[in-house]
Structure formats: structure tokens, C-alpha cells
């Protein structure tokens, strides 16, 4: 009986106190809210907010050494604990700007899914998938930086609107590869 209680307590501690997921996957129709930003602002940062987004991927390799495409999982994620804002410096445009960063990551997750679907993998699948990922990730980072530069981190409202439209068009273009 004591063993059963001890096992029950250990399971409660192990699973009962687990925090919310460390990442939040991109979902169509779901927009970020300020409550999703749970991190603390970087000391000395001149920015009003920062969203930490990226792409995660998981693959299964068959006994032949080739990736099983049907079991591949590619997601764009938002990382709440690494994302933050300064309440006194934000407005509705700031949140839209941060959402566009998340949407850019989703565009690249779709591009990654498309590349995987079209690629003919060999027994060298692990290296091949890493090459594809590195190329997509480089493109994602470049686009994120270009977005911030051209919109002046959400200050240039006209550039912001153009970028929002551009990213929405890309989401539509890559819709067949939505998660």
C-alpha cells in the first residue's frame, strides 16, 4: 500500500506540476494575445516587444535508412517564456507586428513541408533533411530581419501593411502544405 501511495505521489509530482507547453504551435485562425507573452523584457532593450518563433521538426527513419515522409512532423512555434513586451510601449500595431513574425515562421514551415514532400531521399536522409532545414531556416531568419528593417520594428505603418499582405499571400500560396 505504501508503494502504491509513493508511486501515486511521484506521478502527481511528475505530471501534476508540469508547466504549460514550452512552445505554442501556429494554428490557422488563432492570433497571438499579449497574455501569450510570458517572458521578461531584455535589460537595456530599446524594443517594445519581442516574439520568439521558430520551426521544429521530427522525422522517423525506416529500416532502409530513408525518411518516412508520412511520419514527419514540422511545426512553426511561438515560445511564450522567451517572448515579452513592455506594457507602456505597446499598441495594437505592435501585436500585429509580432503576429506577422509568427506568420513568417509558419510560411517557412510550409515551405519545409513542401521541400520534404518533393525531395527524393536516399540512405543519407539525416544529412539531406539537415541541408533542407538549414536552407529553410536561413531563409526564415533573413525574411524576419528584412521585415524588421523595412517596417522599422512596426514604426513604419505603411511598410507594415505591405508586409502583412505579402505574408498572407505567402500563407495562401503554401496552403497545400499547411500542417
Feature map (PLM): residue ranges:
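Active-site recognition of the HExxH zinc-binding catalytic motif
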Residues: 93-105
Amino acid at each position: 500500500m505504501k508503494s502504491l501511495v509513493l508511486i501515486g505521489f511521484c506521478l502527481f509530482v511528475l505530471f501534476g506540476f508540469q508547466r504549460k507547453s514550452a512552445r505554442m504551435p501556429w494554428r490557422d485562425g488563432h492570433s497571438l494575445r499579449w497574455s501569450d507573452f510570458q517572458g521578461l523584457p531584455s535589460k537595456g532593450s530599446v524594443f517594445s516587444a519581442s516574439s520568439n518563433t521558430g520551426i521544429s521538426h521530427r522525422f522517423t527513419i525506416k529500416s532502409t535508412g530513408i525518411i518516412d515522409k508520412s511520419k514527419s512532423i514540422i511545426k512553426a512555434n511561438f515560445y511564450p517564456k522567451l517572448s515579452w513586451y513592455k506594457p507602456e510601449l505597446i499598441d495594437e500595431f505592435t501585436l500585429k507586428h509580432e503576429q506577422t513574425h509568427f506568420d513568417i515562421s509558419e510560411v517557412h514551415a510550409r515551405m519545409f513541408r513542401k521541400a520534404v514532400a518533393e525531395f527524393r531521399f536516399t540512405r543519407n536522409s539525416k544529412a539531406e533533411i539537415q541541408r533542407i532545414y538549414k536552407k529553410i531556416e536561413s531563409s526564415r531568419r533573413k525574411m524576419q530581419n528584412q521585415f524588421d528593417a523595412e517596417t522599422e520594428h512596426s514604426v513604419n505603418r505603411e511598410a507594415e501593411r505591405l508586409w502583412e499582405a505579402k505574408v498572407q499571400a505567402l500563407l495562401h500560396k503554401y496552403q497545400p502544405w499547411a500542417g
